[in-house]
């Protein structure tokens, strides 16, 4: 009898939960239409992979790419709509969130053609790779629109789990296994730290989880200047720091970059930073509104450490991927300047603009590394010597991307950094901007060192890898080269394009 009553209660509770979920999807589903397109693409990929043979591999690429492009289109059609909060306060839709979602989708769209030939040559499982990329993209998009503490925790976990699997995708590679282990352990530790910070925030606000309601709760409980908020700030900064990978939370970055498959590194190097930056702007700006001086100081310390350590250690690297890992640590220091400046003085607009340029610069560089690695089997910087004599197309594609990362005029990276530093200077961050300028000069040194190697014609400096290099034609239908050309063109955009990009970024501010 008791079992029968319990069974009936369970059925009733399950029915209520199902009906509530159906009601939310029915009335709020339109607010996550771009995400729904990706979910539909994931379902199609699973169905095709489980019911077809190897002959349908092109369909897998087509479906994944089409899903991403359609999701971007849905985002663009939704541009300039009124901000809306949906799913009982869990999700917020506005232009500011959507611009970050657009950047994540753009990264994923460019990474898929960049991965095609690599996957074929290394005989990696294609369907699973595409599933992990799309699922990570989905997690990043939900993180950009997250409006409560639970979603802010669950969404990056979705992204992180796929990242762990992607980084260890080449199971027979010892370096890949080592990188995955470090990534997984540090990721788990950082998630625990982040949740601990959320618990302090939850308790101090009187049990609120929505970001704006947390602010109201802190005012009602008079806890906005309490030690508990300071503890929450420290723990949350450390947790988010793992995703952004500034110093000293960068220990996992070089090993993961070196050990993971190169297309995976290209994907993780940009999407994780875009998603984490979107989350950081909302968490620091809203719940910690009353602690702005404290989190400004914390982020300034992280930015200074990142710019100095990242660029100085990059000079000593012999692996191209490790060099780019330390370079990315320095780059995130520049992005943090925009987060500190915030809404005032165009900080967020300059940060968004620089991240757009960083996507093109970084993915263009990684596309060149993928091609070089497939043709030579090496990642050593020294082995790039004399590449111009064998493959001028690849050498001349890599050079502008590296120069743009260094911030040399008239390339896109120069104007992106210029606007970012100018906004920081106007906000009074004189010391931070000065460090940024000095470290940018340091970064130019090690980028120019690589370009000098590329262009050398002296036989004694050319390694056997380049001597035996299989020369490619100037024009190719190769999907990696197509992705590379798009990124190189975007990296060399002159300053005349800055004003409309800045205007669009300014239009997204909440």
From Swiss-Prot:
Q: Write the signal peptide boundaries.
A: none
Q: Does the keyword RNA-binding belong to this entry?
A: no
MF annotations from Gene Ontology: NADH dehydrogenase (ubiquinone) activity; quinone binding
Q: TM spans, by residue?
A: 24-44, 57-77, 99-119, 124-144, 149-169, 183-203, 227-247, 295-315, 323-343, 354-374, 395-415, 418-438, 484-504
Q: Where in the cell is it found?
A: Plastid, Chloroplast thylakoid membrane
How does the record classify its membrane topology? Multi-pass membrane protein
Please tell me where this protein is predominantly located: plastid
GO biological process, alphabetically ordered: ATP synthesis coupled electron transport; photosynthesis, light reaction
Family to which this protein belongs: Belongs to the complex I subunit 2 family.
User: Which NCBIfam families does this entry report, sorted A to Z?
Assistant: NDH_I_N, PRK02504.1
**Protein's job:** NDH shuttles electrons from NAD(P)H:plastoquinone, via FMN and iron-sulfur (Fe-S) centers, to quinones in the photosynthetic chain and possibly in a chloroplast respiratory chain. The immediate electron acceptor for the enzyme in this species is believed to be plastoquinone. Couples the redox reaction to proton translocation, and thus conserves the redox energy in a proton gradient.
Q: What is this protein called?
A: NAD(P)H-quinone oxidoreductase subunit 2 A, chloroplastic
What organism, scientifically named, is this protein from?
Gossypium barbadense
Taxonomic lineage from the root: Eukaryota, Viridiplantae, Streptophyta, Embryophyta, Tracheophyta
Q: Which gene encodes it?
A: ndhB1
């Amino acid at each position: 009898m008791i079992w029968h009553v319990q069974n009936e209660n369970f059925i009733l509770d399950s029915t209520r939960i199902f009906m509530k979920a159906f009601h939310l999807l029915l009335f709020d589903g339109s607010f996550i239409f771009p995400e729904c397109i990706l979910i539909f693409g994931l379902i199609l990929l699973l169905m095709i992979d489980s019911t077809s043979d190897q002959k349908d591999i092109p369909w897998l690429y087509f479906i994944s790419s089409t899903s991403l492009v359609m999701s971007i289109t849905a985002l663009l059609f939704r541009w300039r709509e009124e901000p809306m909060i949906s799913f009982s306060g869990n999700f917020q839709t506005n232009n500011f969130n959507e611009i970050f979602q657009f950047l994540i989708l753009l990264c994923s769209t460019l990474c898929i053609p960049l991965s095609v030939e690599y996957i074929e040559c290394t005989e990696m499982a294609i369907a699973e790779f595409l599933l992990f990329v799309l699922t990570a993209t989905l997690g990043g998009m939900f993180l950009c629109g997250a409006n409560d503490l639970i979603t802010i925790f669950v969404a990056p976990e979705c992204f992180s789990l796929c990242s762990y699997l992607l980084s260890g995708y080449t199971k027979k590679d010892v370096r890949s296994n080592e990188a995955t282990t470090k990534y997984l352990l540090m990721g788990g530790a950082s998630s625990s730290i982040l949740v601990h910070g959320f618990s302090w925030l939850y308790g101090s606000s009187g049990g609120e989880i929505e970001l704006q309601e947390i602010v109201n709760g802190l005012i009602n409980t008079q806890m906005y200047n309490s030690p508990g908020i300071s503890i929450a700030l420290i723990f949350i900064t450390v947790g988010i720091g793992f995703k952004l990978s500034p110093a000293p939370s960068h220990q996992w970055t070089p090993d993961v970059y070196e050990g993971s498959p190169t297309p995976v590194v290209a994907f993780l190097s940009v999407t994780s930073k875009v998603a984490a930056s979107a989350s950081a702007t909302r968490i620091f700006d809203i719940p910690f509104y009353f602690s702005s001086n404290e989190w400004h100081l914390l982020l300034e310390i992280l930015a200074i450490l990142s710019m100095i350590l990242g660029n100085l250690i990059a000079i000593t690297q012999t692996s191209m991927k490790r060099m780019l890992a330390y370079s990315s640590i320095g780059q995130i220091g520049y992005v943090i300047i925009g987060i500190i400046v915030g809404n005032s003085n165009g900080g967020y607009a300059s940060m968004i603009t620089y991240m757009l340029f960083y996507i093109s610069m970084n993915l263009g560089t990684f596309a060149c590394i993928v091609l070089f690695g497939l043709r030579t089997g090496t990642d050593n910087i020294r082995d790039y010597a004399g590449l111009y004599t064998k493959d001028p197309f690849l050498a001349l594609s890599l050079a502008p991307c590296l120069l743009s990362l260094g911030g040399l005029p008239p390339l896109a990276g120069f104007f992106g950094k210029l606007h970012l530093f100018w906004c920081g200077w106007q906000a009074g961050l004189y010391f931070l901007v000065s460090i940024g300028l000095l470290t940018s000069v340091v970064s130019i040194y090690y980028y120019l060192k690589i370009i000098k190697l590329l262009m050398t014609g002296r036989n004694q400096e050319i390694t056997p890898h380049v001597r035996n290099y299989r020369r490619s034609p100037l024009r190719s239908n190769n999907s990696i080269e197509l992705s590379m050309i798009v990124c190189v063109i975007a990296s060399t955009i002159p300053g005349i394009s800055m004003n409309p990009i800045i205007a669009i970024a300014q239009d997204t501010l909440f």
